[in-house]
């Protein structure tokens, strides 16, 4: 059985929860051959892997969403070749732009015409007519030129992805909807294979939250972008044979966005709790500090600035508190610098940015961990903290509430939940956690029992073994438990 993982903007280029999950999944099934379709912004990412690839990951195909000679409204081109749509192609393209029910097979086939130029199509007469009709129907109160260029910007990366010759596999496993779901749906159309969608966060909601806060897009144009991401997710839900999510509320959101409930299966995350046993603790010198740890990527979605400001307030009451921010800071260097500058401007002491580290070297030395994200799914960092007997302070996003309070499991609270971006509330939680050692230990043990009861890697592996074998059986494929053997890793474009 050959499984093609389709991932956008994460594995194997960026360290994080989803990347770690993909790496763990592939390594959990040495009997399956995996290939990877990795979607990234541009060629600057080419081959820059931060993970050592498993032996059963045999090929990596890279898709660059900005891989074209295009500048907004100022493209240098020798000539414009007209791309003429058939009546059927025109109708389905119009349906897609108008967010109506669309025969996507026609769209997929269109972009696999030989020599079809995305640039020429977007600059051509047919796309102009489609944009004009959409404008006249729904957006005639705004400037048409701005609307037209917005549509071109929206569809450029999607159309570029649709030109990809997707490698053949028995199962396409997309680790999100969005562009991953588009490619997975197209692969199913051309190869007749099965399609599995696994959402960690709800892609549409995450993009919507980003767009609402974004300064580069304003007014009605935010809604136009949001509708585009909804459309892409709906396509993935419609074409998928199965859709998984991490917790019950995520299932509700998927259904709200149009996913048929009979397709959805809740599959919680799982970690190897044994690797986090017997971690090194504090040295005698380190015991003078109360250590608060944050395992994260230094990016805006993790809201590190709120964490730093909350720590500055908390440290006024707990003088021996120390904040350890553990994780890479190179994904958004501008934001990382703003965080460093914030620490300096606040004049706060004892904030350590470690960069990328082996969490096992640090986690045992923490008294509690901290997560101030504005969006999450089911954070692996919380599960890892629990496996190390550490309580957690987390914002009320994603599945954090259930991870901290449980779902009537009888284990009790494993930390403190706060509102997002609430500096005072987070600071108070840090003080409370720091001064109550007995409560810290009780919460840490509750988390340890919870993670071992519901979130172990062997449990997750068994669920996905059942899912993968089910797809294999339905396609009459051979299934063996023997490790897949390959001698050469080949990276292809």
Put a short name on every predicted segment.
Residues 249, 270:
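Carbohydrate-associated surface elements
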Residues 280-313, 324-326:
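Conserved donor-binding/catalytic core segment of Leloir-type glycosyltransferases
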Residues 322-337:
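Glycosyltransferase donor-sugar binding loop
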Residues 336-356:
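Nucleotide-activated donor-binding/catalytic signature segment of Leloir-type glycosyltransferases, i.e.
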Residues 391-394, 398-405:
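Short hydrophobic beta-strand element within catalytic cores of glycosyltransferases
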Residues 425, 432, 439-454, 460-470:
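A short, well-ordered alpha-helix in the C-terminal region of glycosyltransferases
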